[in-house]
Design a protein with these regions (language model features):
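Short, cationic-aromatic polyanion-contact patches
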Residues: 2-9, 19-22, 54-64
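Short helix-to-turn junction characteristic of helix-turn-helix DNA-binding domains
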Residues: 15-16
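A short acidic, leucine-rich amphipathic alpha-helix
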Residues: 25-29
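Glycine-centered, phosphate/nucleic-acid-interacting loop/turn motifs that mediate DNA/RNA or nucleotide
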Residues: 48
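A generic secondary-structure micro-motif detector
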Residues: 2, 30-31
Length: 64
């Protein structure tokens, strides 16, 4: 499980390398389930690699 989360975190990192994305767009780009996406985001957040930004009702994620 830990290895899969790390792999998914790498895929999220690659998707965010071109700039911040809204959560729904990120999920579509990396083709992960909601559970797997949030696990990968948690991994990257704990490592202080990403930031979250709320605009209106949408949440964006980007690389630090």
């Amino acid at each position: 499980m830990k290895i899969q989360i790390g792999t998914n975190a790498g895929n999220v990192w690659k998707a965010l390398s071109n700039g911040k994305l809204e959560i729904k767009a990120l999920k579509k780009a990396v083709k992960l389930t909601e559970k797997d996406l949030y696990a990968a985001l948690g991994w990257l957040a704990r490592e202080e690699k990403i930031f979250f930004e709320e605009n209106d009702a949408e949440i964006f994620v980007g690389l630090i």
